[in-house]
Amino acid sequence: MQTILMAEGSGLDFTGEVPLSDFSKYLLDRVKQLEERNVRLKEEYRKIELEKKSVENKKVQYEREIRKLTSELDRLKTPPLIVGTILDVMANGKMIIKSSTGPKFVVNSSQFINSKEVYPGAKVALNQQSLAVIEVLPTVKDPSVLGMEVVDSPEIDYQSIGGLEAQINELKETVELPLLKPELFQKVGIEPPKGVLLYGPPGTGKTLLAKAVANRTKATFIRIIGSELVQKYIGEGARMVRELFELAKEKSPSIIFIDEIDSIGAKRLDSITSGDREVQRTLVQLLAEMDGFDPRGNVRILAATNRPDILDPALLRPGRFDRMIKVPMPTAEAREQILKIHARKMNLADDVDLRKIALITDESSGADLSAIVMEAGMFAIRNNRDVVDSSDFNAAVAKVMGERNRSMAQESGVMFA
């Protein structure tokens, strides 16, 4: 027991006895309550600190966003620059430029411009007030010209082409070998051929050969159809030809394949219309790029046509097309090879003899034989069969050859009921 003195006038006895165990319990409970309150306050403090850090991070983020938006706003408020062309570079660092509005000026240039990028004909950006050269603009090419580059190689190789072994060997010698083994030509002391013309009837595999070259070589392959160079406005076709060869030089070693070159390479005549004159301007630019004053570097040209008789003689001379490869109609052995290539994935019956089919398809091109194989498969599907037999091929030959003979007869003036 413990004696506890009580204050006077408290209404209690001056002295009293309180059990020690009850007071200890009171103190322990009080300490426990204070500890729990302390833990809660610490937890609240920790949460407030985390919220403070989060708010500070957001503040930094918002300040960064404000600076970004302010910079973008200032950039958008910047007055536009004038596009001009350099005519001449003077010795004192000044330049003679021609603005897009027409007049010519002698102006200063920024000291941060690389002198190697400054040359007559370069596009530059000019200040609106002083017309000082601020920067040199990159050379812009026509998007249609940039789209001519073949990025994904075709899935055609020389094994997919039948009956053209001699043409394939010539193509390897003139196109592939100079790109893969140029040291051979240096040892012999000759310049490799830079131009190859493939000519022959339609459907004989000229474009297939070009696809195989694109698949085999690691050079940049640029494909264009001749009619794409025929433009509406004067000078547009010549500009596309110039940009086409510039692209080929930048990405050399490269191969330019011009399909249906007869659309722009026809003989030049005296009596012509305004449209013919524009085609002739494009042809002249093509002739200059193929074998003109400026060397074209490690750029090979491959062209195809089925009308070599109408091509301009200047286009066919050595130096432009050094080698002309004829792609003839396939022989019986070649037709059999072509049929085997197209039918190698087909489910054929035992009675199918591709040799006999090759013999009865005289004067058929590779495209005709491909159509015959496809039609034979269609006849089998029509009869609900998964095996192609000889009757399907006979029907396909009759259909394809009959349509071809009918079209040829109509062209010659024969009428059918």
Swiss-Prot record:
**Is Coiled coil given among the entry's keywords?**
yes
HAMAP family xref list? PAN
- Record the organism: Methanocella arvoryzae (strain DSM 22066 / NBRC 105507 / MRE50)
Q: Which UniProt keywords apply?
A: ATP-binding, Chaperone, Coiled coil, Cytoplasm, Nucleotide-binding, Proteasome
Q: Where is this region: Docks into pockets in the proteasome alpha-ring to cause gate opening?
A: 415-417
Q: Which family does it belong to?
A: Belongs to the AAA ATPase family.
Positions contributing to ATP binding? 203-208, 342
Q: Output the Gene Ontology cellular-component terms.
A: cytoplasm; proteasome-activating nucleotidase complex
Q: Name one Pfam family in it.
A: Prot_ATP_ID_OB_C
The record's section on PANTHER family has: 26S PROTEASOME REGULATORY SUBUNIT (PTHR23073)
Quaternary structure annotation from Swiss-Prot or TrEMBL: Homohexamer. The hexameric complex has a two-ring architecture resembling a top hat that caps the 20S proteasome core at one or both ends. Upon ATP-binding, the C-terminus of PAN interacts with the alpha-rings of the proteasome core by binding to the intersubunit pockets.
Tell me the GO molecular function terms. ATP binding; ATP hydrolysis activity
Q: Which residues form the signal peptide?
A: none
- Positions the record marks as coiled coil are 24-78
- Keyword Repeat listed? The answer is no
Q: What does this protein do?
A: ATPase which is responsible for recognizing, binding, unfolding and translocation of substrate proteins into the archaeal 20S proteasome core particle. Is essential for opening the gate of the 20S proteasome via an interaction with its C-terminus, thereby allowing substrate entry and access to the site of proteolysis. Thus, the C-termini of the proteasomal ATPase function like a 'key in a lock' to induce gate opening and therefore regulate proteolysis.
Q: Where in the cell is it found?
A: Cytoplasm
| Name the UniProt record assigns to this protein | Proteasome-activating nucleotidase
Q: Which GO terms describe its biological process?
A: proteasomal protein catabolic process; protein unfolding
